[in-house]
């Protein structure tokens, strides 16, 4: 109780301070929180209502009972009191305060402190019980820890004893292992010595076998003995520090030489025996070409298994031991010598027979000769593979040597061929049929043959280029046209009539072929496309074909040029083709210009111009499919500066400057300024064709314009001269009063021009249709002519309005522009 009283002292002091502070709120007259009268009345009403505050209605009776049972040390009966006052009375009774009354705040705080102390004591009871319970467990754990420490001490003692025993046992085990290791090393040393001595001990065994008279390279024990000999040599060679190393190595080498000699003798004798047997079949040593090759290959293939196993062993060892490589080379040489001895005469005989059979047909000769050599090369490679497994370059050398015999026969024939068709066909055979079709598909076996074919192809191409130069000079540049070649437009009219008659017959008999299905010079035209249209991408149907478009109707130099280029295109290199094409096209253009002049002299100027335009169009269209540049570069030396410098140094005024020791020395100036210049010129044949075509079209347009409106242009030129004189101070004029410009004469002039157009225009259009036979081309070519005529008439109309009165204009009666347009109308 004394402790409780001590605890209540500070609490009572705190309550007193609180009450004093609360009193300050209400103190008069200095109030800390003054209230209004209304607020004061409200507080009094609340105080009166709070004096008899009941237990909250929402608090269940069960909770109240539970709270009471936990907080108060009294036993509640199962019967719930009927009123709250009974419950409170029992609570105060349990605290010994049933006689006390709480009327002031101090009494309430005292009661509350007492109640709280009682509750704290009740609450601490269970913790004290738990503390006592846990203390018991702690004592038990301390006892267990003591037992564990005792067990650990016993285990530590046991571990020390175990380590002592283990160390003793390990020492014994290591001693045993060391003894076993020494025993194993001694055994290995003995085996190693025995293994090394075995290579030396094999010498006597191998030497005995090699000296045996019954030893054969085909026996079962020869190959194993050979392998053992190789192993011994390899081993001894790799240990030069052994005792008696040079002696044993020399002895083993001698054994190897004996074995190699036996193998070489057997193989060489086998091959030579085969050759001698085959040669004995023909006393003249030149086997019959019909059955010789069959015997050559059958006999050798039958004998191949006898030596193939032995040769395989040699090839396997050739990379490691030089003696085997030398033996393999000797066997290769022997084999190839025997094959050359057999094949050389037979190939020469066969080539001679082919030459005699195809003496006049060079293409057939080249085809048959190349096919024969292809079979020979393939058969030789297959036969070689029957004997050997590794390739050798000596086989290709032999085949190249055999192919030279074919080349030696063909070359004299090639260099005497003069026809471009034959030479181009030979190029096609060698390049396409032989190199591309055969050699590329089997390059390994035909490599040697390809070298000879390439040399032959180069000779043919060289001959083709040479003959092409001559052909261009003789048949194009030097071509002398026959009268029939220049019979234009007569031949076109005749062919048109023939075509029309055939077309009429076709209408009568539909089953017969029309003229459009007839191809002239079919053999040559297969390599060329039909031409004549300015737009090759839009060819005309064959039913509207022009006679000038037929291959046979082309001017001979054009036909020859295009045929020549078509044959050269796939036969020679692009650079060479560019040079030849430029030369051929230039010569062809010059021949066309000459033919055009001749036709213009013999017939009319329009025929010559249209002839030139038509054939230039053909040239431009036909060279378009050649996917190459028709450009060549020419290099020239310009000596103009050298000449000027030489003249300058020869001038007497410069002689004193020869000996000057400065930059004004004449000799130094000559060396610096007189250096010749190298100039490069590019010649483009396609642009040359286009340039001449443009020039021909411009000449045609100018000539036709002059034909139709020349008099009007002369009249307007006079008027312009008259105006110029007047503007420069000359006498004034009245154009209608000039003798040559009177309305009646101007009327005659306009009527004559209109009549000329009306009468000669159909002739011009007819000629264009006959030569060009293409509405698009005709429209494009005639359009500038029509525009020029219209421009002249427009200027003429403007001149009439400016210089003549309306009455004079009516007298002149110049055709209107609408009339002129209708007259010049050409449907596209």
Curated annotation (Swiss-Prot):
Q: Check the record and name the InterPro entries matching this protein.
A: COG3_C, COG3_N, COG_su3
Carrying Phosphoserine, the residues are: 663
Whether Transferase counts among this entry's keywords is no
Keywords recorded for this protein, A-Z: Acetylation, Congenital disorder of glycosylation, Golgi apparatus, Membrane, Phosphoprotein, Protein transport, Transport
Domain of life of the source = Eukaryota
Q: In which tissues is it expressed?
A: Widely expressed with highest levels in pancreas and testis and lowest levels in lung.
Instruction: Give Gene Ontology CC terms.
Output: cis-Golgi network; cytosol; Golgi apparatus; Golgi cisterna membrane; Golgi membrane; Golgi transport complex; plasma membrane; trans-Golgi network membrane
Q: Where on the chain is N-acetylalanine found, per UniProt? A: 2
What is the topology of this protein in the membrane according to its UniProt annotation?
Peripheral membrane protein
Tell me where it resides: Golgi apparatus, Golgi stack membrane
**Disordered, as annotated region:** 504-543
Comp. bias (Polar residues): 525-543
PANTHER family of this UniProt entry?
CONSERVED OLIGOMERIC GOLGI COMPLEX COMPONENT 3 (PTHR13302), CONSERVED OLIGOMERIC GOLGI COMPLEX SUBUNIT 3 (PTHR13302:SF8)
State the disease linkage annotated in the record. Answer: Congenital disorder of glycosylation 2BB: A multisystem disorder caused by a defect in glycoprotein biosynthesis and characterized by under-glycosylated serum glycoproteins. Congenital disorders of glycosylation result in a wide variety of clinical features, such as defects in the nervous system development, psychomotor retardation, dysmorphic features, hypotonia, coagulation disorders, and immunodeficiency. The broad spectrum of features reflects the critical role of N-glycoproteins during embryonic development, differentiation, and maintenance of cell functions.
Q: How does it assemble?
A: Component of the conserved oligomeric Golgi complex which is composed of eight different subunits and is required for normal Golgi morphology and localization. Interacts with TMEM115.
- Family under the similarity heading: Belongs to the COG3 family.
Name-wise, this protein is Conserved oligomeric Golgi complex subunit 3
Organism classification: Eukaryota, Metazoa, Chordata, Craniata, Vertebrata
Q: Which gene encodes it?
A: COG3
């Amino acid at each position: 109780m004394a402790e409780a009283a001590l605890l209540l002292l500070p609490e009572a002091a705190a309550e007193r301070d609180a009450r004093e502070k609360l009193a300050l709120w209400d103190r008069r007259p200095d109030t800390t929180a003054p209230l209004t009268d209304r607020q004061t009345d409200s507080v009094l009403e609340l105080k009166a209502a709070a004096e008899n505050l009941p237990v909250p209605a929402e608090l269940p009776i069960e909770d109240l009972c539970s709270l009471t049972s936990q907080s108060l040390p009294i036993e509640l009966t199962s019967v719930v009191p009927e009123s709250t006052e009974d419950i409170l009375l029992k609570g105060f009774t349990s605290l010994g305060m049933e006689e006390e009354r709480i009327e002031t705040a101090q009494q309430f705080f005292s009661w509350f402190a007492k109640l709280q102390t009682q509750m704290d004591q009740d609450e601490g009871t269970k913790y004290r019980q738990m503390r006592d319970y846990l203390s018991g467990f702690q004592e038990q754990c301390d006892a267990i820890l003591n037992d564990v420490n005792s067990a650990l001490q016993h285990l530590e003692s046991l571990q020390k004893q175990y380590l002592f025993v283990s160390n003793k046992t390990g020492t014994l085990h290591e001693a045993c292992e060391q003894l076993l290791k020494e025993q194993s090393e001694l055994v290995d040393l003995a085996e190693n010595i025995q293994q090394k001595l075995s290579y030396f001990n094999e010498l006597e065994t191998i030497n005995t076998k090699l000296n045996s008279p019954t030893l054969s390279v085909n026996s079962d024990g020869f190959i194993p003995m050979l392998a053992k000999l190789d192993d011994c040599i390899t081993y001894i060679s790799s240990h030069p520090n052994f005792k008696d190393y040079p002696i044993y190595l020399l002895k083993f080498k001698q054994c190897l030489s004996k074995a190699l000699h036996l193998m070489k003798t057997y193989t060489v004798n086998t091959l030579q025996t085969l050759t001698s047997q085959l040669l004995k079949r023909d006393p003249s040593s030149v086997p019959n070409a019909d059955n010789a090759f069959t015997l050559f290959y059958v006999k050798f293939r039958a004998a191949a298994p006898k030596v193939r196993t032995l040769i395989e062993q040699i090839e396997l060892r050739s990379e490691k031991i030089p003696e085997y490589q030398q033996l393999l080379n000797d066997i290769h040489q022997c084999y190839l010598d025997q094959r050359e001895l057999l094949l050389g005469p037979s190939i020469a005989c066969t080539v001679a027979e082919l030459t005699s059979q195809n003496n006049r047909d060079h293409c057939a000769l080249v085809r048959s000769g190349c096919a024969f050599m292809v079979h020979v090369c393939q058969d030789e490679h297959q036969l070689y593979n029957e004997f050997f497994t590794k390739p050798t370059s000596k086989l290709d050398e032999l085949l190249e040597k055999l192919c030279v015999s074919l080349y030696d026969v063909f070359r004299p024939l090639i260099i005497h061929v003069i026809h471009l068709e034959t030479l181009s066909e030979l190029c096609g055979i060698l390049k396409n049929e032989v190199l591309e079709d055969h050699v590329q598909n089997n390059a390994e076996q035909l490599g040697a043959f390809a070298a000879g074919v390439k040399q032959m192809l180069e000779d043919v191409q060289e001959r083709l280029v040479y003959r092409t130069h001559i052909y261009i000079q003789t048949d194009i540049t030097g071509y002398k046209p026959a009268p029939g070649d220049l019979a234009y437009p007569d031949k076109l009219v005749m062919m048109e009539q023939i075509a029309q008659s055939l077309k009429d017959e076709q209408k009568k008999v539909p089953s017969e072929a029309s003229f459009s299905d007839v191809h002239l010079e079919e053999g040559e035209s297969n390599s060329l496309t039909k031409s004549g249209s300015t737009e090759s991408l839009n060819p005309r149907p064959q039913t509207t074909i022009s006679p000038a478009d037929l291959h046979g109707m082309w001017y001979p130099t054009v036909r020859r040029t295009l045929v020549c280029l078509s044959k050269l295109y796939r036969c020679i290199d692009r650079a060479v083709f560019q040079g030849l094409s430029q030369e051929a096209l230039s010569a062809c253009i010059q021949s066309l210009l000459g033919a055009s002049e001749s036709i213009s002299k013999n017939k009319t100027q329009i025929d010559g111009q249209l002839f030139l335009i038509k054939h230039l169009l053909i040239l431009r269209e036909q060279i378009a499919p050649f996917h190459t540049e028709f450009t060549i570069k020419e290099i020239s030396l310009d000596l103009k500066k050298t000449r000027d410098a030489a003249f300058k140094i020869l001038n007497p005024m410069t002689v004193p400057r020869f000996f000057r020791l400065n930059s004004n020395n004449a000799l130094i100036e000559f060396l610096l300024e007189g250096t010749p210049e190298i100039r490069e010129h590019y010649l483009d044949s396609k642009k040359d064709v286009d340039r001449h075509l443009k020039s021909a079209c411009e000449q045609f347009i100018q000539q036709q314009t002059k034909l139709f409106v020349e008099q009007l242009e002369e009249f307007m030129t006079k008027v312009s001269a008259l105006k110029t004189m007047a503007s420069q101070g000359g006498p004034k004029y009245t154009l209608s009063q000039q003798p040559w410009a009177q309305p009646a004469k101007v009327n005659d002039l306009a009527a004559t021009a209109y009549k000329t157009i009306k009468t000669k225009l159909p002739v011009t259009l007819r000629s264009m249709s006959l030569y060009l036979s293409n509405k698009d081309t005709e429209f494009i070519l005639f359009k500038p002519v029509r525009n020029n005529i219209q421009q002249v008439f427009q200027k003429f109309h403007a001149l009439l309005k400016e210089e003549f009165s309306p009455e004079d204009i009516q007298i002149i009666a110049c055709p209107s522009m609408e009339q002129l347009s209708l007259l010049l109308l050409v449907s596209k």
